[in-house]
């Protein structure tokens, strides 16, 4: 670990100023340029001061969205995402997003308007907004910091920022009386020192152990996740795969990392195509870089063969979290790949996976022929829809997906690299995608952000249509509307239970989106989609597609979960 360079806080000047103003200036001087929130009486002054100081305040229509906006911004930029929410009911509204943010590993600073430290906040009686904000946010997984006095407020901010910068969600609690108190303007900039992880290689002993296993393998499979992308390991891993004759697969979060490689099988697990599954089953060793091997990557333990497993991760606790690794390599993905390249002997030309037949099989694969399309007169198979959208949407895009049964579309929509793809399933819930997409769109306005969301998650966050138009965000919203809670529908159906309560009327959302200022269309057939193709290729303003999809199409993980449940 090495010390990162100090951040410096607000410019100094003479006189006094309220704490909220000093903190706003400190935050801007740290290089933070955006904050997301929904004003409350205990945060309105701070939000206004932030905006005045040059930290653009983006107002959301719900606290849950404000927090997920900050997380989406942080995920995309690698910089601290700031959310500002009030206490009591505002925190209750935002708790869903707070738990989610704490599980993503993104650097998020949640500034919380806390009750006054003494007396009755309203001066009249019981505080109707009373809630244990510190206790609630700690239980949500956040590290909490409180400004207990006007004099300690700047140090509390410095500590919170330092912890967030390390890849954590933290909360800074600012009691109203502390915010309003006047203090001397600082004579010195605020110093924020934080530890920055220095990429480290694996130990010699672990490299030797991995080399011994790989040398014996004739059909190795290399699996890479988002961690490999963030480590910049793509080229080193591809060179290693060429040396040892390995096929390449990724997790869903690492999708398209090896796009263009002749031995790339795409995603492994619940989002695999048939060739990937068939080829992966033939592997006699699996080498994993920067992936947790969760239940979607392993299809509940069925997608990877029972062969020696070598797992590489920069964080020791991530190894063997889901599957037991035979060899653990604790180190940076790129450095470890380079170590293995140097340690492994040159292999003969006999590489069973690297032959002309394999290359032809992979290059000739047509995803549209990998399933029986289930289009009807008034609905589309979501997979067919996604294959068409792949050709119509701008290539240089960010893709954000909410959660739900419609996630079967993930393998059919590509991105330039894994950093342009954002899943929001870290809390296994729906309703988080819209906020994350707003944050991504703000972070990267030069690209079109495509949000794919189900009707259930959309209805939870529909008010943010106004935010998209107000902030002029470059977005295309693809509503996968099966008129149902699709995951629950198939959960019930797979257990031979009645599904009526999971199904809803067919509502046309396009006119609603038009009322907010979107270009909108209802899509029931491919002909409907082709009519809007010119606008999709070069969007000029936000676009909303209410895509009516066939609710009978189940995502693969629905049946996988049912089978897993049956075995246990």
Predicted regions and their residues:
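Thiamine diphosphate
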Residues: 107, 118-129, 320-322, 328-330, ...
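Conformationally flexible catalytic loops at phosphate/diphosphate-handling active centers
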Residues: 14-15, 131, 159-216, 370
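A short, small-residue-rich loop immediately preceding and capping a beta-strand
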Residues: 33-36, 56-58, 76-113, 223-226, ...
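Glycine-rich phosphate/diphosphate-binding loops that line cofactor/substrate pockets in enzymes
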Residues: 22-33, 72-78, 161-166, 206-220, ...
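Glycine-rich, acidic loop regions that bind phosphate or pyrophosphate groups
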Residues: 3-7, 112-156, 174, 253-357
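Active-site diphosphate/adenylate-binding microenvironment
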Residues: 20-24, 28-31, 38-41, 45-51, ...
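Phosphate/pyrophosphate-binding active-site segments
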Residues: 2-15, 148-151, 171-174, 186, ...
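Glycine-rich, anion-gripping cofactor-binding loops and their flanking helix/strand elements
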Residues: 75, 93, 226-310, 416-447, ...
